[in-house]
């Protein structure tokens, strides 16, 4: 599914979020770089947007982008080459990461965590590959907020977005999956508890009236 929508993935992210995803990603980068990490993993990197932002902001850091979809990675590599950025992109399974213990000082995930088949197992792997004192930053769509804004947002997210996304990408199934996966995703407090159970010290912030959320987990 993700491989099929790769060619228009970036365009759709910008259009369907009205450009807000770039602001959210920049905030995630700010939080990831607070501790001046030297080794950074961007997991579920997709076409590499966040990995490239990290490298631009921290040119002296080693940045690795990992994803399970080769077509996404191919686009990420082309983008890195075009921008003259040295980022290593590789294929990897989030539930069995091909890295030694403590390999990274920071791990970021933007809009990929909810696609993992086993959240607890993924968090265990993320904790394992982080060095002591390392930081995990998870940018995700929580379930839609309540109230009047939430009602309008649900109509857009469940009706308009799947139609437009399917029309532009040619894959209606992928953009029907998006709202379904968001509705099934843990609420911010539940994800915080899940990360804490994995050993992280956790805080989170809501963005754009709760449309997106960033969870920050520090490994002791």
From Swiss-Prot:
It is an enzyme of class 2 (transferase). Its EC number is 2.1.1.163. Gene3D superfamilies: Vaccinia Virus protein VP39. The keyword Transferase applies. S-adenosyl-L-methionine binds at residues 47, 67, 93-94. It comes from the Bacteria. One of its GO terms (biological process) is methylation. Keywords: Menaquinone biosynthesis, Methyltransferase, S-adenosyl-L-methionine, Transferase. One of its GO terms (molecular function) is demethylmenaquinone methyltransferase activity. HAMAP family: MenG_UbiE_methyltr. This is Demethylmenaquinone methyltransferase. The lineage of its organism: Bacteria, Thermotogati, Deinococcota, Deinococci, Thermales. The gene is menG.
């Amino acid at each position: 599914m993700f491989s099929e929508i790769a060619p228009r993935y970036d365009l759709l992210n910008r259009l369907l979020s009205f450009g807000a995803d770039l602001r959210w990603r920049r905030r995630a980068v700010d939080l990831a770089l607070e501790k001046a990490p030297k080794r950074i993993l961007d997991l579920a990197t997709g076409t590499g947007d966040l990995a490239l932002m990290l490298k631009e902001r921290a040119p002296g850091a080693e940045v690795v982008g990992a994803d399970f979809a080769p077509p996404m990675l191919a686009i990420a590599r082309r983008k890195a080459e075009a921008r003259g950025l040295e980022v290593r992109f590789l294929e990897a399974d989030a539930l069995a990461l091909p890295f030694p213990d403590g390999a990274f000082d920071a791990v970021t995930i933007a809009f990929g965590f909810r696609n993992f088949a086993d959240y607890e197992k993924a968090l265990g792997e993320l904790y394992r590959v982080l060095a002591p004192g390392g930081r995990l930053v998870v940018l995700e769509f929580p379930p839609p907020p309540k109230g009047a804004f939430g009602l309008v947002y649900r109509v857009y997210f469940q009706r308009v977005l799947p139609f437009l996304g399917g029309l532009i990408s040619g894959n209606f199934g992928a953009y029907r999956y998006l709202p379904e996966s968001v509705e099934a995703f843990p609420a911010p407090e539940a994800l915080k508890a899940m990360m804490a159970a994995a050993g992280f010290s956790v805080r989170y912030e809501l963005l754009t009236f709760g449309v997106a959320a960033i969870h920050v987990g520090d490994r002791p």
